[in-house]
Amino acid sequence: MSYQVLARKWRPKTFADVVGQEHIITALANGLKDNRLHHAYLFSGTRGVGKTSIARLFAKGLNCVHGVTATPCGECENCKAIEQGNFIDLIEIDAASRTKVEDTRELLDNVQYKPVVGRFKVYLIDEVHMLSRHSFNALLKTLEEPPEYVKFLLATTDPQKLPVTILSRCLQFHLKALDETQISQHLAHILTQENIPFEDPALVKLAKAAQGSIRDSLSLTDQAIAMGDRQVTNNVVSNMLGLLDDNYSVDILYALHQGNGELLMRTLQRVADAAGDWDKLLGECAEKLHQIALMQLLPQKSSDNNEHFSFLAKHISPENVQFFYQVIVSGRKDLSNAPNRRIGAEMTLLRALAFHPKFLTAVPKANTTITPPPSTPSAVENTGNYVDVPVLSQSIKSAYSQAKPNKTSIPNLASLSALDALEHLTQLENQERQEHKAESLAVVSETLHHIQELDEEKSHKKMTALPVREMTEPKPKHIEKPTLPSNAAQAPQKNSTEENSSDDNVEIAQDEQEILSADTYRWEWSNPELAKADTGVCPSDIKQAILKDITPELRLKIITQTQQQDQWADIVERSGLTGFSKELALNCFLQSKTDDEINLGLHSEKSHLRQDRSIKNLAEALSKLQGKDIRLTINLDDSNVTTPIEYRRNIYQALREKAQNELQKDSKLQILLNEFDAKLDVESIRPV
C-alpha cells in the first residue's frame, strides 16, 4: 500500500477526534442528539482548522445506518462510503472552480430528487465565498426553503465576502485557530503512535510555524520526517524552517543583562556569518523577553522552561525587561529606514545597551563626607546686597578629586565568578592597599586644611559686602576672585575661567560633580601598575564562566559519582552508548537482571523514548558488553525509583549547594565584600 500523508491518515473519524473547536462540536452533537437540525450550516475559519472534516463528520452523523446520531458507528456502508469520499448522497462542490451561474443552476436542478441511499442529500460547498454574485442570487431561494431531505453545508475562509442574505439563512460556526500548545501535543501523540522519535523543542517550532493550522503542522511534520530520516530533531526543523539558533537570541539577552558590548558584537557577527534574518532575530529576542516577563509574574509556571530563562528572569529587573522589549519592538519598525538591515538591528541593540545601568552609573556621583557650613548666604540676597564669591583653584579641585576613592576602577564583584574574583583581586589588594591608604590620607588631610581656610576667608568676606543695589539693577556679569590664602597660593596654579554665578553656595560636591560630569572625563586607575596587572583578565570573560553550569571536569565528576551510587548507571557508561539509545538508557531503571536477561522500567512520561531502533541499539550494546546475547525488556513503570538521569541532577544540586555554603562562609570573600560594599550573587554560583 502506498504511503498516506499524516494529514489524511489522521483526519478525525469521530467528533471526539477533533482537536479543539469544543464550542462547535458541542452544538452539532446536541443538535444531532435532539434531532434539532437546521437546513443550512456555514463553517468559517482559517485554513486547516477542520471545516471540511467537521462537515463530513456531520454528514456521517446524518446518514449513519443506525440513525441520526452524534456518534456514528464508522462501520456501516454509509459511514465507510463518506469516509472514502464516494457516498452518492454527499455532493462535494469546489466553489473556487465552479463560479458560474450555470454551474449553480445545474446543481439546483438536482435538488428536487430524493437521496438514493442515505437519509439526507447533503451539499458540501467549499470556499463558497468564491461564487459569483449571480450564483448567490440563484442559490438564495433554494437555500431559504430547501426540501426537508436536503442539507447545505457551506465552508469558507472569508465570511466577510458572503452576501448578508446568505449569512442570514445559515447557522454560522466560526472555527478558531489552534494555539501552539494544542498543536504540539497533537503532534506528539501522532509521532508516538507512528513510532517516530522526536524532540519537544522541534514540535514547538513546528506548531509555531503552522500558525494555528493542524493541516499545515502535519505537512511540515511530514517534511521534517523526510529530512531527518524518520527522526524529528530540533536541528532538522530549524534548518528546514530557516530559523536561527536559539543560542543567538539567548546570548544577546545575556549581553544586554551584563552590559557586555563584546559579547553582543560577537553574537551579531555569528548571526551575520550564518546569513540570519535580522528581523527574525529581533523578533526572537522580543519573544524571549515576553517569556521572561511571564516567568517573573508567574514563577510557579517556570519549571518547564529553559534554565537560561530562569536565570535571566531572576537577574533582569522587570523594568529593564519592559525597556529592552520596547526598544527592540520599536527598532523592528526602523529596519526599513536603515542603510541596511544589519545596521538597523545593531543600532537597535546598541541603543538598548546604551541605557544599561552599568553605563548610567559609570560616572560616579559625589560621595563627599566634608560638608560646607549650611548657613552660607546667597551671593545676591533679596535685599539687593551682593558679595564676591571665592573660587576654588584647579589644584584644590584636583587634589580633592584624587582624595575620593574611585569605585569604578574595581570591577563589580557581583558580576564576576566568586572564585575567580577572589583569587584575582586578593593578589592586587595585598600589593596596593598599604601604599594607597597612606597616599589617600595625606591628600585628604591637605584638602581639609585648604577647605577650612577657605571657609574662614568666606565668612570674613561676608562682613565686607558692597553697597546695597536696587533690585531693578541688572546683576553683575562677573564676580571678582579674592586673593587666595597663602597655603592655597603655594599650590600649582592653572588657568581658571571666571564663572557667572548668582549664588554663593559653592559646595565641594558641586565642584567635584562638574569635574566628573565633564565630557572629557574618563575614570583611570590611580596606580598605572594596577591597570597593567588587570590587562590579562576581561570582566566579561570572567562573567561568562559562571554561565556555563557544567564544565567537562564537573561532568566527569557527576558521572563518576552516579556510577558509584547506581549499578545500572555504571552499566550504561561502560556500554559506550550514544544518542537516543543512551538517553533511553539513562531514563530507565533496573528492575531485574540475570545472566542472559535484563528487565528495565521506564516512567510513562518518557514513553516516547521507547523506540524500536533505540531498544535494538541498547540490546546490542549490552550484549557486546556482557559477551553474549542479552534479552532486553523495557516496561512502563511509574514506581518511585531513581533513574541515572535523576541521580545526576541530585548530585549536581548537592555540589551546587555545597559550593554556595563554602563561599558564604569564606573569610577572605567576606573581607572583599565588606571592603568594596559588594553583595554575593548566590544564584550565580556554580560548582567546578
Swiss-Prot record:
Q: Name one GO molecular function term.
A: ATP hydrolysis activity
Q: Where does ATP bind?
A: G45, T46, R47, G48, V49, G50, K51, T52
Q: What is this protein called?
A: DNA polymerase III subunit tau/gamma
**Pfam family, any one:** DNA_pol3_tau_5
Report the EC code(s) recorded for this entry.
Answer: 2.7.7.7
Family according to the record: Belongs to the DnaX/STICHEL family.
Is Metal-binding there in the keyword field? yes
Report the enzyme's class at the first EC level.
transferase
Q: Which domain of life is it from?
A: Bacteria
The miscellaneous annotation reads:
As has been shown for E.coli (strain K12) and suggested for Salmonella typhimurium, the gamma subunit (approximately resides 1-430) might be generated by ribosomal frameshifting, leading to 2 protein products from 1 gene.
Per UniProt, the ranges with Basic and acidic residues bias are 470-481
Q: Which residues bind Zn(2+)?
A: C64, C73, C76, C79
- Give the compositionally biased regions (Polar residues): 484-499
**GO terms for biological process, alphabetical:** DNA-templated DNA replication
Enumerate the SUPFAM superfamilies for this protein: P-loop containing nucleoside triphosphate hydrolases, post-AAA+ oligomerization domain-like
Q: Which reaction does it catalyse?
A: DNA(n) + a 2'-deoxyribonucleoside 5'-triphosphate = DNA(n+1) + diphosphate
Self-association or partners: how does it assemble? DNA polymerase III contains a core (composed of alpha, epsilon and theta chains) that associates with a tau subunit. This core dimerizes to form the POLIII' complex. PolIII' associates with the gamma complex (composed of gamma, delta, delta', psi and chi chains) and with the beta chain to form the complete DNA polymerase III complex.
Q: For this UniProt record, give its keywords in alphabetical order, as a comma-separated list.
A: ATP-binding, DNA replication, DNA-directed DNA polymerase, Metal-binding, Nucleotide-binding, Nucleotidyltransferase, Transferase, Zinc
GO cellular-component term (any): DNA polymerase III complex
User: What SMART domains does UniProt report for this protein, alphabetically?
Assistant: AAA
